[in-house]
Amino acid sequence: MASDAPTGGSLADRISNPAETTEPVADKAQLDGAASNQGGSDLAEPEYNVEVKLSDLQADPNNPLYSVKNFEDLGLDPRILQGLSAMNFRKPSKIQERALPLLMGNPPKNLVGQSQSGTGKTAAFVLNILSRLDLSSEQAQKTPQALILAPTRELARQIVGVIQVMGKFLDGLHIGTAVPADTNARPTRMEASVVVGTPGTVMDMIKKRIMVAAKLKVIVLDEADNMLDQQGLGDQCIRVKALLPRDIQVVLFSATFPAHVHQYASKFAPAANELTLQHEELTVEGIKQLYLDCASEEDKYRTLVQLYGLLTVGSSIIFVKTRASAVEIERRMVAEGHTVASLTGGIEGSQRDQIIDQFRAGHAKVLITTNVLARGIDVSTVSMVINYDIPELHQPPNRPRQADFQTYLHRIGRTGRFGRVGVSISFVSNREEWEMLNQIQKYFNTDIQRIDTKDWDEVEDIIKKTIKNTRAQAGFR
């Protein structure tokens, strides 16, 4: 029966014969930022350094002018400072310390930044945009002055949410969205000071003169590496930019900078100041990583069902490889009386919005998804991520399977948004999957602890203790 406890796996024993343990491995000490009521920003940041490379090679990037320790030092509109306070931001995160002076200088300069989700980069580019808006007249308020391009409607909607909170005290701020929708639902004219959208829809609206681009001052391309991973989106962004004023400030953020992304960034944002995180920050510290041996694909499902009670302690995301898997797992679990939802790229846009909203509000505790959610979506209540299928790169049929390290990082980062800690559990059912897990351990120089499923009560006890311990280390109450 599907609800039976899964069989005890011993795949790792057979392959590498590791020493067994049922005690959670102690997390490395976390260097959390101060809580908001103690003058911090609720950003529990790991130690990392932000490196700056200026387009003006004669300038000193370590000059104090290129760093800021307090939002008040930026000369912001008091109403924007009120918005920051509403977000519990008391001081800049490390990336904001360096990014904000570069973004907000005059005359405006282009910026290319490397930053993962969860470091405060969205707030940084939104702050720059709000500080540059002219809201002095109704006509100005309803004329697009800033454009943000995102790879998915989910990320676009989340960015809109950040703008709404940060700009809630700005009279006359109008925010528009340009995402795939029923053509009949589109406005005949985009009347907004800030527009957030996906590249194809934005390009279509500009070409059809629904959106006027003549007054745009800033364009932001978020998640550039994710854009380039999706067929055609990178080219669409270039075509959108070609329709904009030549003197527009160009801001590009990307979580990773392999050669093709760096080349693209140089083309999209020429003569830009550059901001990068040193490699130490691009780690998975702060997230307790576990794995479970499963005897087969069917055993994966039985393991998932057995975990259901733990998944609903907070909110959980289950990542699978294909849309078909997400739909089938949802069907089986719902048939067995479990409350779950699935989210894939195949679901119509407004329905996807509804699913995300229900999950964010806590009405749905368990979400099954493909990589639609792996980047950029901030659901702060997520305490556990399940890698039902280990993420892997697309390889030719004759090549060995290769783990996708960046997707793994972004997946499990759902539990560690803004430095919060959480738990990730990967399922391993064959030698190839175990080898991909081992690749991940070596790449991130981290230990992923094996949990023996022979005694399921003990498995639950270990995971509960792990969740409790990681929350305690983060200062949760």
From Swiss-Prot:
Domain notes: The Q motif is unique to and characteristic of the DEAD box family of RNA helicases and controls ATP binding and hydrolysis.
Sorted UniProt keywords: ATP-binding, Cytoplasm, Helicase, Hydrolase, Membrane, mRNA transport, Nuclear pore complex, Nucleotide-binding, Nucleus, Protein transport, RNA-binding, Translocation, Transport
InterPro entries: DEAD/DEAH_box_helicase_dom, Helicase_ATP-bd, Helicase_C-like, P-loop_NTPase, RNA-helicase_DEAD-box_CS, RNA_helicase_DEAD_Q_motif
Residue interval(s) of motif Q motif: 69-97
CDD domains, sorted: DEADc_DDX19_DDX25, SF2_C_DEAD
Biological processes annotated in GO: poly(A)+ mRNA export from nucleus; protein transport; translational termination; tRNA export from nucleus
GO cellular component, one term: cytoplasmic stress granule
Pfam name, any one: DEAD
EC number: 3.6.4.13
Lineage top rank: taxon: Eukaryota
Chain residues that bind ATP: S115, Q116, S117, G118, T119, G120, K121, T122
Domain Helicase C-terminal: residue ranges: 303-459
Subunit details: Associates with the nuclear pore complex.
Organism in which the protein naturally occurs: Emericella nidulans (strain FGSC A4 / ATCC 38163 / CBS 112.46 / NRRL 194 / M139) (Aspergillus nidulans)
Compartment(s) where it occurs, according to its Swiss-Prot or TrEMBL record: Cytoplasm; Nucleus, Nuclear pore complex; Nucleus membrane
Family: Belongs to the DEAD box helicase family. DDX19/DBP5 subfamily.
Function summary: ATP-dependent RNA helicase associated with the nuclear pore complex and essential for mRNA export from the nucleus. May participate in a terminal step of mRNA export through the removal of proteins that accompany mRNA through the nucleopore complex. May also be involved in early transcription.
Sequence motif DEAD box, residues: 222-225
Region (Disordered): 1-43
GO MF term list: ATP binding; ATP hydrolysis activity; inositol hexakisphosphate binding; mRNA binding; RNA helicase activity
Helicase ATP-binding domain location: 102-275
Record protein name field: ATP-dependent RNA helicase dbp5
Catalyzed chemical reaction(s): ATP + H2O = ADP + phosphate + H(+)
Topology in the lipid bilayer: Peripheral membrane protein
